[in-house]
Amino acid sequence: MSVTTEARPVPRLKQRYREEIAPALREEFSYGNVMQIPGVVKVVVNMGVGDAARDAKLIDGATRDLAAITGQKPAVRRAKKSIAQFKLREGQPIGAKVTLRGDRMWEFLDRLVTIALPRIRDFRGLSPKQFDGAGNYTFGVIEQSIFHEIDIDRIDRVRGMDITVVTTATNDDEGRALLRALGFPFRES
């Protein structure tokens, strides 16, 4: 009995990063060491559902949507403190979060850049100013229907989400150059 191990296909964006983007970044910033080249560590997709404090069923829709978009089961985030003004008790579910790494991360970024972002109405590009000073980029998406995995007829309510791309870049310029090379459509400011 022989066992054949079929190699899994390498995600398209990951292959492009290895073959084209990393060498171009090394040349642009003249790095002496290969490990200095900025790369993507993880992508965190967070969906805050503040209304879940009043209706706990709303969190189910958010987790279903996030699971469909990312291909991974989301972690339900719970309130750390009770806040009387918001009618919030400690331990109540108020959001859902997914952390993507490895091949799932590369495939999600590829779908985000090539399919989802162009589907946003009146989209003029992402703001190039939303970097955190350490090369990481966070932006918000107003509705989940831009992802083709979501069936528009089955949406119970429009939910937005925050997407954070964590990189190994040491400053914003390196992070911006990396994400621009990966295909992120930054608007000219």
Curated annotation (Swiss-Prot):
One of its GO terms (molecular function) is tRNA binding. The keyword tRNA-binding applies. It holds the Pfam family Ribosomal_L5_C. Keywords: Ribonucleoprotein, Ribosomal protein, RNA-binding, rRNA-binding, tRNA-binding. GO terms for biological process: translation. One of its GO terms (cellular component) is ribosome. InterPro entries: Ribosomal_uL5 (IPR002132), Ribosomal_uL5_bac-type (IPR020930), Ribosomal_uL5_C (IPR031309), Ribosomal_uL5_dom_sf (IPR022803), Ribosomal_uL5_N (IPR031310). It comes from the Bacteria. This is one of the proteins that bind and probably mediate the attachment of the 5S RNA into the large ribosomal subunit, where it forms part of the central protuberance. In the 70S ribosome it contacts protein S13 of the 30S subunit (bridge B1b), connecting the 2 subunits; this bridge is implicated in subunit movement. Contacts the P site tRNA; the 5S rRNA and some of its associated proteins might help stabilize positioning of ribosome-bound tRNAs. Part of the 50S ribosomal subunit; part of the 5S rRNA/L5/L18/L25 subcomplex. Contacts the 5S rRNA and the P site tRNA. Forms a bridge to the 30S subunit in the 70S ribosome. Belongs to the universal ribosomal protein uL5 family. HAMAP family: Ribosomal_uL5_B. This is Large ribosomal subunit protein uL5.
